[in-house]
């Protein structure tokens, strides 16, 4: 399954059962949790024009588009939620790159506490990256995704740097005969670029993994523990979350 868990025919199952496929770390909910305030409305019949100009009704559209979950909040109150057979309020569902925003939120907490300084260089926290694309870049560059690197985020890649990244992070199987040194070893070899840091935005998933590494190094605990402590507990989270790990225990942020 590790070779095809993101393929359309099994993705809806695997997105709800990732902990059976990959190493993960639990992130504790609040104790006690806080219940959502609600002002529920039935929005199934809400109509809108889709990208083709055709009129759709929300409930039918969510089912036809193979959505798993959908929620509407207004003024801090839950107005509407919708679940397919692959979603439920207490079911853990992968959120992919939403984790990047969550990691930045956690970094903001540590910045506010004086633990992380956005003006310092990344290598002040992670000297291991001194010979990678991250050399000379600041934490501000990292948070803004303005790191100059030769990494290409190519989701169709089958044998290049992006596939190597997926294998290093345990999202794809290691080929027979290949060596797996893990995600953080991959980050130490991040390909460099002739461009200067801070000159353009470059969306690059490994940057968030570097941020997760800085968070662990500066925060003195695992990403999962720090996220539980500083985000899930204060916001009153009702259910446990998790984050996937590589085979060495590094979080895939």
What are these regions (language model features)?
Residues 1-88, 113-116, 144, 148-150, ...:
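N-terminal leader/targeting segments and the immediately adjacent pre-domain N-terminus
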Residues 60-61, 81, 105, 109, ...:
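Residue-level signal for well-ordered alpha-helical scaffold segments within enzymatic catalytic domains
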Residues 76, 94-118, 142, 211-215:
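Active-site SXXK
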Residues 77-82, 121-124, 158-196, 222-240:
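Short, charged, amphipathic alpha-helices and their helix-cap/turn boundaries
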Residues 89-93:
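Loop-to-helix entry region of an early transmembrane alpha helix in multi-pass inner-membrane enzymes
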Residues 94, 112-155, 189-192, 206, ...:
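Active-site helix/loop module of the DD-peptidase/beta-lactamase fold
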Residues 96, 201-203:
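Catalytic tyrosine of NAD(P)H-dependent dehydrogenase/reductases that use a Tyr as the general acid/base
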Residues 197-200, 252-253:
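Active-site rim elements
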């Amino acid at each position: 399954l590790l070779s095809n868990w993101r393929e359309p025919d099994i993705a809806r199952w695997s997105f709800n059962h990732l902990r059976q496929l990959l190493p993960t770390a639990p992130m504790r909910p609040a104790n006690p949790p806080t219940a959502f305030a609600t002002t529920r409305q039935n929005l199934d019949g809400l109509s809108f024009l889709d990208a083709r100009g055709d009129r759709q009704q929300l409930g039918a559209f969510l089912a036809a588009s193979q959505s798993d979950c959908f929620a509407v909040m207004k003024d801090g109150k839950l107005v509407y939620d919708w679940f397919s057979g692959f979603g439920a309020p207490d079911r853990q569902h992968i959120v992919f790159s939403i984790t990047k925003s969550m990691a930045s939120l956690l970094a903001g907490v540590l910045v506010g506490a004086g633990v992380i300084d956005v003006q310092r260089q990344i290598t002040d926290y992670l000297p291991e990256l001194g010979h990678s694309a991250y050399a000379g870049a600041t934490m501000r560059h990292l948070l803004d995704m303005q790191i100059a690197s030769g990494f290409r985020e190519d989701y169709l890649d089958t044998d290049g740097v992006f596939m190597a990244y997926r294998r290093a992070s345990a999202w794809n199987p290691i080929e027979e005969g290949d060596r797996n040194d893990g995600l953080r070893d991959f980050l130490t070899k991040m390909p460099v670029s002739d461009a200067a840091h801070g000159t353009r935005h470059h969306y690059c998933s490994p940057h968030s993994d570097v941020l997760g590494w800085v968070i662990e190094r500066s925060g003195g605990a695992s990403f999962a523990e720090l996220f539980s402590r500083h985000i899930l507990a204060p916001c009153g989270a009702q259910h446990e979350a998790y984050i996937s790990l590589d085979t060495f225990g590094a979080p895939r942020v």
